[in-house]
Structures are given as C-alpha cells and as structure tokens.
Amino acid sequence: MTLSELTTELRKDYREVSVRWKAFMPKFERMRKRQAMFPWFWEATVKTKRNNSWSIVYYAFTKKDAACIWPQIYITFRPENATWAAFFVDGEDKSFLFLSTSHFFERYVERLLKSSRQEMGCMVNDVVKYFFLRNHHIMSRKLELEGSIKGLCEDGIFLGDLLSGDTGLVKTYLSRDELKVNQYTEYFEAMMSGIVSDMFMSRNRHTMTDEEEAELSDEHYSTFVWREFLFSRNNPIWNELFVDCLTFRKEHLEEYRKISDMFEIIADNRRDARC
C-alpha cells in the first residue's frame, strides 16, 4: 500500500471512529465523574469495518486533572516491520493527519529519557501509547520552510515533511532542552494557551470555542492564576513544564519579547488575510 492509499484509508477509518467515539462520549463523561481512584488509566480499542484497530487512551493524575483532558485517538501499523503511528489534529478548515515514523519514536525515547522526565513512575512498554498518554495538547503549526511540517506537544516539538496539504510525515523530535530561543518562545506561548484552554474546560466542562476565547477576562492570562490552577490540578508533567517555561522566559526575556511580538504580528496578518 502506498502512502497515498494509506492516508485515504486512514481518513475513511477515522470518520467511522469519530462517529463511534462521539456516541460513546456521554458514557465516558459519566465514568470520569464517578471515578474516585487516581491516577486513572483507561483505554479502549475500536475495530473498524476495514478491520483496523484504533486505540483510545487516557491518563489522569487527579480528579481536577481529569476535568481538563480528553482521551487521545491513534492507530499503529508496521510498514517494513517498523512501528509507525497515525493521528489527527483539528485544524482551521479540516483535520491534519500526522504519520509518525519509527525514527520519530526512537528519538522521542532517547531524548525524553535523557531529560529524566518520567512523571508517570515508570516507562510504559509501548512507547507509542506512552507518547499519547503524556501529550494532550498536540498542535500543528504553519510551515516555515516549503515542504516541511512542525508540531508542538507538552514534551517538545516534532518535525517532518509535508506529503500533501493536509498530511505530514513526522520524522524527528526535539525535547525542551534542545530548543533554540525562537522555538522555545513559540513552544512557551503554545503551552500557555494550553493552560488557558484547560482552565476553561475544567470550569465549563466543554472545549473552548473561538468566540468564548475572545471574551475571556484578563484573569485567564495571569501567571499567578496559572500557578494556582496548576497547583490544584497537580499534574507533574505540567508542573515541570510550567517551571521550565518561566525559567526560560526569565533567562531570555529581551529575546522572548522581540520574538513574541513578531509572532503576534504574523498572526494578525494571517487573520487579516482570512477576512
């Protein structure tokens, strides 16, 4: 099967999985509200009409942590006897498909272990599952180089090649320790945006819309409020991430401000272009 044929099948499959997951969501929400023992690990498998098995995984450290996150959906497959994974990230117009190569997961384990971040107590044998249990905010970003892709997640940045307008091949991973100042600035702002959306979800029990984001008060962008929220949430992955980000900003404040202003101008220009 070619990559083009594979992506076509995955998109058809994902539509089926999405419909079935949406039908199950009310039951999952009741399970989440009743759950009393934490940390809580939950997983399920969805077998599609094409006989493909998709994984749905979820890990929450505390009750308040559980209120902030939804399960991750992905599928693994083995071209040429090497483990790959596929997952979708919602975009402005349609979902973007990421195909993660075995090389990406090799680099992920190598660099994550090097940083000694093992907040879940021990490494999960299945590295693909471990990645999706740790990373709930997986975001795609506009291309910097023609034919390239970039994504951000709690554990760092991933890079690769653009296969088509809505499909990318993920090849490698950079941990927070390896990021340059411009990369860390983009990462910092993406993760702080993640805190804002998690705060909203924990209070309102649904994902924030663009209209709701535009109406948020200044309180949602206060470092002090973020710190209080993370303290009560008690997710060690986010606690360490937050400390690392604030340390970075303190050590590179002038560069951070310049790059942040540049990103804001670029974002404004893109919004104007869409109007």
Label for each model-derived stretch:
Residues M1-C275:
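Ribonuclease/tRNase effector modules and their secretory precursors
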